Amino acid sequence: MRLSRYFMPILKENPKEAEIVSHRLMLRAGMIRQQSQGIYSWLPLGKRVLDKVNAIIREEQNRAGAIELSMPTLQSAELWQESGRYDAYGKEMLRIKDRQERPMLYGPTNEEMVTDIFRSSVKSYKDLPLNLYHIQLKFRDEIRPRFGTMRSREFMMKDAYSFDLTREGAEHSYNKMFAAYLRTFDRLGLRAIPMRADTGPIGGNLSHEFIILADTGESEVFCHKDFVDFDIPGESTDFDSVEGLQAIFDKWTSLYAATSEMHDEAAFNAVPEGERLSARGIEAGHIFYFGTKYSEPMGAKVQGPDGKEHFVHMGSYGIGPTRLVPAIIEASHDDNGIIWPASVAPFDVVVINMKAGDQACDDTCELIYAALTKAGKDVLYDDTDDRAGTKFATADLIGVPVQIIAGPRAVANGEVEVKDRKTGARETMTIEAAINRFVA
């Protein structure tokens, strides 16, 4: 992508409305723009990151055996009246009527709808277990939306829903998502700590929030510091192994970890003083087991091996991609801008032409740009006629992991400079070596 033809409206000054680092940097880097209170457009640079976050989420959901579908944003109020949540949910839910005056709602979550899909399609235990997920925009009318897309009214959510014949089966499905979430956050460059949490309006009797430690977090959290160094389940994790997944769950729930809502001061004080960690955190994911809370009132049941009908046991599992993007920035930035993990960076490398219009610099940059693009790399080519300082500031601000810098003096020697955005380390190498670093 040539920067001269790309839409990336950089802001030179810090926006006054931005309260936290991620909000400020996302606005300055031209990733998002506010349309109304708590509602944002994702501009091209931001959407590239969001798409890569979603790709990782999809890969890990699929690896754990979940199946993607797509459900509508608008839902019938009748389904929510069936479950008993229509009146209980409160003013966060946006209620509307269609032209026939039928009550509808802009879905804040999808337990009712997915249960309706299940009950009309699945009749036998032989079709279980089943886990369905989708990635969709949702709306919750927050009293005080703030921090950009960290706490917005319209947001994107990956929500998955599991269906099992028994509680034991449902707990295995819960453990699958538990392990999948640990892997997802790790691949995003984040360390998320699962903490026992309140079930809230979703309901149920088992729930964990996945918390990313950050000074700007909304919640106060308390945990054992060893969580910071726990090993993440590997790529070879067997998601069909009941014992293996239970061992992962047991390990990650063996030490004290709780949000402020579930905090037990006495239990926390029992942790040796030097091993206690109290901090602030960002909720990045939330999983629930709620048994037959929805299947019973909505009649979602299957015929079991005994020939009798059984209400299915359910769980739901949410991750907010539009919240994860700022969470990654909160965890990885410096005074100059964002430092993206390679897995979600909008581009793999930025090629910086220090003297656009100089034949040698132009030819060198075109050569590198073409070679890396042909190799399947996402490349941003700064071919603008901006000053060198502006080019460097832009590259640092948007956080692309590697910068390849081509100036007249280096190019005359057949060389370019390669800079690592995270460490700041610079290395001069031949043009061929710079290309081979990415295509070898």
Swiss-Prot record:
It comes from the Bacteria. GO terms for molecular function: ATP binding; proline-tRNA ligase activity. It is found in: Cytoplasm. NCBIfam families: PRK12325.1, proS_fam_II. Catalyzes the attachment of proline to tRNA(Pro) in a two-step reaction: proline is first activated by ATP to form Pro-AMP and then transferred to the acceptor end of tRNA(Pro). InterPro entries: aa-tRNA-synt_IIb (IPR002314), aa-tRNA-synth_II (IPR006195), aa-tRNA-synth_II/BPL/LPL (IPR045864), Anticodon-bd (IPR004154), Anticodon-bd_dom_sf (IPR036621), Pro-tRNA-ligase_IIa (IPR002316), Pro-tRNA-synth_IIa_bac-type (IPR004500), Pro-tRNA_synthetase (IPR050062). Transmembrane segments: none annotated. PANTHER family: MITOCHONDRIAL RIBOSOME PROTEIN L39/PROLYL-TRNA LIGASE FAMILY MEMBER, PROLINE--TRNA LIGASE. One of its GO terms (cellular component) is cytosol. Its EC number is 6.1.1.15. This is Proline--tRNA ligase. HAMAP family: Pro_tRNA_synth_type2. It holds the Pfam family tRNA-synt_2b. It comes from Rhizobium etli (strain CIAT 652).
